[in-house]
A protein has these predicted regions:
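Structural cue for short, hydrophobic secondary-structure segments
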Residues: 52-55, 79
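The serine-hydrolase catalytic nucleophile loop
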Residues: 56-67
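Flexible "cap/lid" subdomain of the alpha/beta-hydrolase fold that forms the substrate-access gate
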Residues: 1-22, 36, 41-44, 49, ...
Length: 185
């Protein structure tokens, strides 16, 4: 069993614009016992599903202003929190956090929720991870809405800016995310 940290639900009470009902699963194949949080709103049999993937250092809260508009179209909206972010469990061992760990969770979640007619909405790391999903499950994905991300092919080294950002995140584990995001508003 993986050692985890779990943020108490009361820490998420009264967040501005984020009064969405949480959903959890701890039964994803390969992730048994790890609690994954996701938002799942709108009709399960909707003609379209928006699958919203956040980046770092955010979580499903990133999409709080888009969700009502997407729901108004009659669609289903699913927005998971990657492990280590938001309401999902946070494994203690940094070695757990690999590309495959996050990507495979998405594959399992799409299958577990039986999502179809998906519009992938991705930003930052959500794009790096999510843009590989339509190639593996082309029958489930129909459209892409891609924002502020890249499509990593693995044939180029990481840029100096990305390496510096990653090191800064390691050196600042108690990052003031609200303050950081406030600078962009």
């Amino acid at each position: 069993m993986i050692d985890i940290l779990r943020t108490p639900d009361e820490r998420f009470a009264n967040l501005p614009g984020y009064d969405f009902k949480p959903n959890y699963t701890d039964e994803l194949a390969g992730y048994e016992g790890l609690r994954c949080h996701y938002l799942d709103m709108g009709p399960k049999d909707a003609a379209n599903t928006f699958f919203c993937l956040h980046g770092q250092p955010t979580w499903s809260y990133l999409y709080r202003k888009m969700i009502p508009t997407l729901l108004a179209s009659g669609a289903r909206v699913v927005a998971p929190d990657f492990f280590g972010f938001g309401r999902s469990d946070k494994p203690v061992d940094d070695a757990v956090y690999t590309y495959e760990f996050h990507r495979n969770m998405l594959v399992e979640l799409v299958g577990d929720l039986d999502l179809s007619n998906i519009t992938l909405v991705c930003q930052d790391w959500g794009g790096l991870l999510g843009l590989t999903l339509p190639m593996e499950m082309p029958n489930r994905f129909k459209r892409l809405l891609v924002m502020n991300t890249a499509f990593g092919t693995g044939d180029l080294p990481l840029g100096d800016g990305f390496v510096a950002w990653r090191q800064w995140c390691r050196d600042n584990p108690d990052m003031a995310v609200g303050k950081l995001m406030g600078r962009s508003c």
